[in-house]
């Protein structure tokens, strides 16, 4: 009898064990880091849950860093505790690629399914180091109550004129953050910029760059159509647009959900004007894999899921991104005419004549020095040509050698 009880008990344990999910010891743990808003966080948590259900032998450890993401990421790499899968943008990517920290992902996806500009944001020496989730181009958000005929804005001078005309009664014609990401559009219009396309030469002192900088500064100090920092008090540029204090606002797709929730007036978007030779600067975010990962095959499989059409649709539905996948970008999910902005195609039209923001591993050091140097240009105390002299350009060039 005793033997029978033991046998039955053993059988029960065996049967129960057959129905159990893999234990933590049997699972491969993949560490995945990302920044992101609450909306993005919620999507990622669901995406991870779905992936784990389909792949019970994998556990994804999600490292969500809502602020100071890259500072945290630097520390993780320095302490040899880096994630297997890393969400990254093209501005910071060179730091990790040049240091040999990212895996070459060439051949892991069908590149024909993606916008070339998005792929180029993560390509170095013809190798792909991250799979793009989105591609970001800057457009002009228009307060249609204040700008009745936005179609008149066909070049940078008609933009200047419309902004000047709209500046009255406490309203500024144009606004955006005083950051290289935004004012660089002015330089690009005149075929200028900060760095050459290969990131090896400073072009900040060239004629087009100086011309674009000065036009931007003149709109602040002469036309008074762009506010000084002190004109904004404690408001952000986005808050000024939401409050009807700005007629035209230069920014990216990420503000669409916020504007849909808070803006009370009629609004839409149009492309930032271009010449026949100028190119819109674009940026991208995507998923990379640490070269040191001990679970590369699992990590690659997870990244393929993150970059799938199914997941791309989830992010696109929020309005936060312009998807890097062409099929999703051209679908009604993104181009829905019943949702604002009704002219979402403006984000895609900008890609027809575009290039990635030229960067190198020292790009942030370069822009930090430029930002400090330009204060007297933007406050009207000096001309751009006085401040951006040969000596300053040579100083910046040291970050390229």
Regions picked out by a protein language model, each given a short descriptive name:
Residues 104-114, 172, 192-213, 260-262, ...:
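Short, solvent-exposed loop/beta-turn-alpha elements that line the ligand-binding surface or hinge
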Residues 93-101, 117-154, 177-198, 281-289, ...:
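Periplasmic solute-binding protein
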Residues 33-34, 93, 182, 214-295:
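Extracytoplasmic/periplasmic substrate-binding proteins
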């Amino acid at each position: 009898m005793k033997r029978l009880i033991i046998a039955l008990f053993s059988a029960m344990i065996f049967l129960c064990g057959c129905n159990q999910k893999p234990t933590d010891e049997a699972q491969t743990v993949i560490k995945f880091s990302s920044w992101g808003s609450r909306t993005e966080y919620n999507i990622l948590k669901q995406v991870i849950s779905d992936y784990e259900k389909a792949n019970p032998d994998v556990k994804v450890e999600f490292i969500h860093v809502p602020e100071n993401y890259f500072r945290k990421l630097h520390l993780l790499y320095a302490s040899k505790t880096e994630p297997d899968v890393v969400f990254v943008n093209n501005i910071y990517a060179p730091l990790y690629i040049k240091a040999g920290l990212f895996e070459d992902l060439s051949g892991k996806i069908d590149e024909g399914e993606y916008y070339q500009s998005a792929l180029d944001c993560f390509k170095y020496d013809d190798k792909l180091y991250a799979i793009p989730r989105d591609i970001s181009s800057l457009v002009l958000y228009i307060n249609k109550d204040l700008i009745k005929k936005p179609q008149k804005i066909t070049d940078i001078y008609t933009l200047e004129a419309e902004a000047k005309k709209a500046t009255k009664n406490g309203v500024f014609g144009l606004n955006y953050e005083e950051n290289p990401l935004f004012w660089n559009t002015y330089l690009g219009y005149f075929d200028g910029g900060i760095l050459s396309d290969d990131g090896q030469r400073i072009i900040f002192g060239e004629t087009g760059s100086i011309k674009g900088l000065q036009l931007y500064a003149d709109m602040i100090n002469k036309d008074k159509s762009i506010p000084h920092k002190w004109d904004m008090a404690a408001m952000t540029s986005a808050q000024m647009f939401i409050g009807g204090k700005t007629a035209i606002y230069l920014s990216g797709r990420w503000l669409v959900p916020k504007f849909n929730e808070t803006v009370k007036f009629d609004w839409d978007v149009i492309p930032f004007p271009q010449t026949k030779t100028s190119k819109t600067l674009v940026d991208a975010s995507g998923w990379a894999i640490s070269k040191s990962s001990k679970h590369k095959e699992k990590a690659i499989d997870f990244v393929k899921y993150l970059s799938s059409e199914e997941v791309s649709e989830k992010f696109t539905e929020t309005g936060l991104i312009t998807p890097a996948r062409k099929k999703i970008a051209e679908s009604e999910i993104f181009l829905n005419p019943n949702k604002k902005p009704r002219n979402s195609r403006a984000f895609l039209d900008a890609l027809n004549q575009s290039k990635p923001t030229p960067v190198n591993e020292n790009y942030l050091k370069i822009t930090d020095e430029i930002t400090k140097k330009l204060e007297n240009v933007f406050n009207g105390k000096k001309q751009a040509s006085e401040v951006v002299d040969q000596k300053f350009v040579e100083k910046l060039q040291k970050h390229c050698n």
